């Protein structure tokens, strides 16, 4: 099936070239080898064919925000840890690359407010529903209906992309999915939207805020669209990749036969040419500096004012604008040690029943605490008992102080940290950026200013690949079209 899809994509490229008389691009540059850069390299090759040279520039490690840390001779996820069951692009990558889903190891969750647990999961589904109803009435049902309505509309993007449609800006993409309602959700808070559909303030404070803190490190004041995507992840079944999620990135680059250049891109310059534009990409690494010309350039890394490594754009009139915003720092600490269950109200550690702890607005020094499993799980693997030394993943807005570590752990063997600029600080006042920066210069990460997740980035990668393809062959009927639900129903 995958081979047939690649064959059809290559045939489509040949037909488009024949129809327009345009040759395919000879060289494409992708800046960034995270999931966005890896996925867009794969999609670009699907559309333009295998003869196009694709150079992928990466200043760090392939995988970006998909990464692992070794603790006691085992590897654990330190970046994006899991994916929603409806992550169709990620599901497709895993299947195409011959990877496997990691075996699930069950564990109960709870929400902590700094003094006690406001909500505790049990092993019985009906009892969990009863507790939600007893504490919050039907707020959880109203939340579920609201999230499902958003997700049902968002899932339209896969059908649009299957028919070759692309969007030059984030606002155009959102409008195609949910019209003005989706665009307005980027300008209105989660709390405001949920109160409007009858969710209680108490449920927002206790449950919704805890989920948003764990996923985004932000509050219910964040925009509703990003919040809905985050809350969808909390409701669906989750999965991860056996051996580590970053294998998807390295696998896609290997499948694409992309030329990975370990270097920092410093400048993209528009070259004076006749006809289609040409872009000169300058870069530097330990070997020195270099540059090359490209027909298409995709920036698959954040571009915003607070980013000290933002690329300089030269020769463009008007100048290239970067996003007027900042990113939310998230510290992930992997602690190998003994949990201080007394802090959570369990003097006897043997009685502590939870593997995952979310927090409300208090305590402020950590957002979530998880007893995590390694990326490779054997058939005989079992989760550590609460009285045993285990590897705990602590998410916090700042590096944990020694006193804070002593609050959470009776003792510990090691602490290893990863600091991420994990997500944009989502604000109703941040304007929605565009994917198209210039004729054949694109910013893949534009979409994460509306919502940020691995699958959303993969959706953006597919959109940018289609956008580049459609613009190259001037197939403008496939760009920024409205009423697409009607159009795709009438297409063969």
From Swiss-Prot:
Cofactor: FAD
Gene Ontology MF terms: prenylcysteine oxidase activity
Principal location: secreted
Cross-referenced Pfam families: NAD_binding_8 (PF13450), Prenylcys_lyase (PF07156)
Entry superkingdom: Eukaryota
CC per GO annotation: extracellular region
EC numbers: 1.8.3.-
Localisation per UniProt entry: Secreted
Enzyme class (EC, first level): oxidoreductase
Residues bearing attached sugar chains per UniProt: 340
Residues in the signal sequence: 1-21
InterPro entries recorded: FAD/NAD-bd_sf, Prenylcys_lyase, Prenylcysteine_Oxase1
PANTHER family given in the database record: FARNESYLCYSTEINE LYASE, PRENYLCYSTEINE OXIDASE-LIKE
Annotated family: Belongs to the prenylcysteine oxidase family.
Function: Likely to have oxidoreductase activity. Required in the mevalonate pathway to regulate prenylation and enhances the bactericidal activity of neutrophils.
Protein name listed in UniProt: Prenylcysteine oxidase 1-like
